[in-house]
């Protein structure tokens, strides 16, 4: 059993001292590979065993591509701004800057202990002013292109946290109350002025871009569903006994004859004007109740609730009078905030109608039970009877639009991005306001975040930066301005950090994002070839990063429409009982402990051998032990030479070893290119088994084996390679396999009589049929089996089988 602690520390020091993994950008090398991890938020908890899974996968790819002659960019950095760092600093009475920098040191040390091939000169930190200067610059460009503006918006306000929360950061507690995901603090809806980025303007470009990338279909579906493009019709329903009208959005205008009621969102501005006096108190109580429910819960597949408004509308197609209801399953922030209820042909409408005993009218001929949502010929619809959906929609849309009763529209579920936070620990906006609240953009960047000792959020919605009096007010050309005191969300830095790695220079500076040198670098290194990270970032982070990148493409900063060519979401590592690891369950495993007991190489190779990269799989101590035993077995190939014969001439090795060796290189290469890392490891295991079986080694083959091993277990590979070489195994060239040597020279052919095996012969590959028959008939066992009986038929498949029919 080798001393992993001694060996791993030795080689980690060697790599750092010799800058073995220093980034190389050879202008004469057209082969580049950019492999990227989703950079971590440096929390106080450090790494757990789930983190190394994705990092090891990118590390294997990086090392493999380097062996194959690529210039490789495999960087690391820190997503260090944001609410979690600030909240933890408040709870522990620390400053977020001090706390964050301490955590970065811990994380960096842990990453180095696992042996990743990061060039730390390329490290980025979103809290570094040299970094966030360009975050601010991108915001300025968005503003100049009318994609950033201040809007009055109903937001999720958490008084205890002192900030606005996204819908995803709000959950329901045991009492069905809306609370913050972090800390469980009460959350209410509150109108506030917020910076908003108009990501909806890019919805179609983001959808189209999915056709240009290699994402899994499930990931593409997540993105498409989040954007939620709907092509439909806004129909105008007049309010009975009123001069008012209600715009209603539908994607199924062909079912308008079956509309039995309308539903408006509780927040709809028309509601106060149309609700009847008798229903006013009931409706108001319902509106107040809805404010406690998140949008996600409102549209979930649960029992729908609603109240009657006391008012009616007139169907423009047939003049029928139908009731107007109020229900929380309709959201004001999607389309018009009003829908028509067609219970016969919509599952949600059907459930609602059944619950409140509303009429149901079928307008599509079907023998199936209701609700029926498929195609068919229309009935009870005078203008379109006998027509299918497409024909009916064309006719009705033409009629309604021509008569100014409707218009064709495109809607998206995607909402514009609320981009401001009422917190301290974030990027300052490069924005000033004059005494008339007119905006002045700051071009001289970065706008530095002032150092505040008191940064506790207010209860009013005012940012802590409002307390930085010396920083707050600016005088320019004799005119006084007040700075924007909100800060950017944590998403900001992560929306472009993959570009920052390309711009980061050895001296710590950044090449300007808008420079010609940046364009030159981007031309070589973009897009990111492989991006690996957790499923939790499959929607928002990925969408925001794609949005910013597409915008930068549109203004000529980057040469590619999409930032990432291939995205892989690695599966989780679960507890031994298939449960998610958590402190409360006591099943969290610290990688530091595994490194101490089994070694970093064992941790790396075990996590890659567990199963497919995308699968979530349980941790197995037995599996970990087995991988350590295998590495010990590899070590003994070099240190138990008395048990093995050393054959110096490769040509004198037996056929099994040669075939296995070349098969290893071929299958290993294919497996890593397909991110099937467990298969690559299996191939290495087969090769080691064959060496032990034959009790033979050859140093040339073993050296090449160590080159393959170095992608997964770099410390041990370096140690064994150094026994006969002075240079690093990680900087060698990938061995090449010979396809011809994978094919055995001899083959064993079964001989059958009437389909039953009687004997086998070992012959040269591709021996012809006539020779095979002669060799078979010369065998005593075959002669005895045939005897004096005549052979009726001879069946021969070269290299496969001989069969005599008697």
Curated annotation (Swiss-Prot):
Binding-site positions, ATP: 583
Predominant location category: cytoplasm
GO cellular component terms, A-Z: cytosol
Superkingdom, natural source: Bacteria
Alphabetical UniProt keywords: Aminoacyl-tRNA synthetase, ATP-binding, Cytoplasm, Ligase, Nucleotide-binding, Protein biosynthesis
Family statement drawn from the similarity comment of this UniProt entry: Belongs to the class-I aminoacyl-tRNA synthetase family.
Stated name of the protein: Leucine--tRNA ligase
Species: Ureaplasma urealyticum serovar 10 (strain ATCC 33699 / Western)
């Amino acid at each position: 059993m080798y001393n992993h602690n001694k060996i791993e520390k030795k080689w980690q020091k060697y790599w750092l001292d010799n800058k073995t993994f220093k980034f190389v950008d050879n202008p004469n090398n057209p082969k580049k590979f950019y492999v990227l991890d989703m950079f971590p938020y440096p929390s106080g908890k450090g790494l757990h065993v789930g983190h190394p899974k994705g990092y090891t996968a990118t590390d294997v790819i990086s090392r493999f591509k380097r062996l194959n002659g690529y210039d490789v960019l495999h960087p690391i950095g820190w997503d260090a701004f944001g609410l979690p760092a600030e909240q933890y600093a408040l709870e522990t009475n620390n400053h977020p800057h001090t706390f964050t920098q301490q955590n970065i040191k811990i994380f960096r040390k842990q990453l180095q202990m696992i042996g990743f091939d990061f060039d730390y000169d390329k490290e980025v930190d979103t809290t570094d002013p040299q970094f966030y200067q360009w975050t601010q610059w991108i915001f300025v460009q968005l503003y100049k292109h009318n994609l950033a503006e201040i809007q009055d918006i109903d937001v999720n306000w958490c008084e205890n946290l002192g900030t606005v929360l996204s819908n995803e950061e709000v959950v329901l507690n045991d009492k069905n109350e809306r609370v913050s995901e972090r800390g469980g603090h009460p959350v209410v809806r509150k109108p506030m002025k917020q910076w908003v980025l108009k990501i909806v303007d890019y919805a179609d470009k983001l959808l189209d871009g999915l056709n240009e990338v290699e994402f899994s279909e499930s990931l593409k579906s997540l993105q498409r569903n989040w954007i939620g493009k709907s092509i439909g019709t806004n129909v105008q329903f007049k309010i009975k006994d009123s001069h008012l009208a209600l715009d209603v959005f539908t994607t199924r205008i062909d079912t308008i004859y079956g509309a039995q009621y309308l539903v408006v969102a509780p927040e709809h501005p028309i509601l106060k004007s149309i609700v009847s006096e008798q229903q006013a108190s009931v409706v108001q109580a319902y509106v107040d109740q809805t404010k406690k429910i998140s949008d996600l819960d409102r549209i979930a597949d649960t029992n729908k609730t609603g109240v009657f408004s006391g008012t009616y509308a007139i169907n423009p197609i047939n003049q029928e009078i139908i009731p107007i209801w109020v229900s929380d399953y309709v959201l004001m922030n999607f389309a018009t905030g009003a829908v028509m209820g067609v219970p016969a042909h919509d599952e949600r409408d059907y459930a609602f109608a059944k619950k409140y005993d509303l009429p149901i009218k079928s307008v599509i001929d079907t023998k199936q039970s209701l609700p029926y949502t498929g195609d068919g010929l229309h009935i009870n619809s005078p203008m379109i009877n006998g027509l299918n959906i497409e024909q009916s929609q064309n006719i009705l849309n033409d009629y309604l639009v021509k008569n100014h009763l409707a218009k064709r529209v495109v809607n998206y579920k995607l909402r514009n991005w609320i981009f401001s936070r009422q917190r301290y620990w974030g990027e300052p906006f490069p924005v000033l306001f004059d005494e008339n609240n007119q905006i002045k953009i700051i071009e001289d960047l970065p706008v530095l975040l002032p150092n505040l000792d008191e940064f506790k959020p207010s209860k009013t919605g005012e940012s802590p930066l409002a307390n930085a009096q010396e920083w707050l007010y600016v005088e320019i050309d004799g005119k006084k301005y007040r700075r924007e005191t909100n800060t950017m969300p944590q998403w900001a830095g992560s929306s472009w950090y993959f570009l920052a790695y390309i711009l980061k220079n050895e001296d710590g500076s950044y090449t300007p994002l808008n420079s010609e040198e940046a364009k030159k670098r981007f031309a070589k290194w973009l897009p990111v070839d492989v991006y690996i990270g957790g499923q939790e970032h499959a929607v928002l982070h990925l969408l925001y990063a794609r949005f910013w990148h597409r915008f930068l493409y549109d203004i000529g900063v980057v040469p590619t429409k999409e930032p990432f060519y291939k995205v892989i979401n690695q599966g989780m590592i679960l507890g031994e009982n298939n449960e998610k690891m958590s402190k409360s369950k006591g099943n969290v495993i610290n990688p530091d402990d595994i490194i101490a007991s089994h070694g970093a190489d064992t941790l790396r190779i075990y996590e890659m051998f567990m199963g497919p990269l995308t699968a979530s799989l349980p941790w197995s101590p037995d599996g970990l032990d087995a991988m350590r035993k295998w590495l010990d077995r590899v070590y003994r190939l070099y240190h138990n030479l008395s048990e093995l014969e050393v054959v110096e001439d490769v040509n004198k090795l037996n056929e099994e070893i040669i075939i296995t060796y070349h098969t290893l290189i071929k299958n290993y290469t294919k497996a890593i290119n397909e991110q099937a890392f467990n298969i690559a490891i299996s191939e290495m295991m087969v090769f080691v088994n064959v060496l032990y079986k034959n009790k033979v080694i050859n140093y040339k083959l073993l050296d090449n084996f160590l080159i393959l091993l170095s992608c997964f277990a770099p410390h041990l590979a370096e140690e064994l390679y150094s026994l006969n070489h002075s240079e690093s195994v990680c900087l060698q060239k990938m061995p090449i396999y010979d396809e011809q040597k994978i094919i055995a020279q001899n083959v064993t052919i079964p001989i059958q009589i009437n389909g039953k095996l009687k004997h086998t012969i070992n012959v040269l590959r591709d021996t012809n049929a006539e020779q095979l028959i002669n060799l078979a008939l010369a065998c005593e066992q075959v002669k005895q089996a045939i005897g004096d009986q005549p052979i009726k038929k001879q069946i021969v498949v070269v290299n496969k089988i001989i069969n005599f029919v008697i």
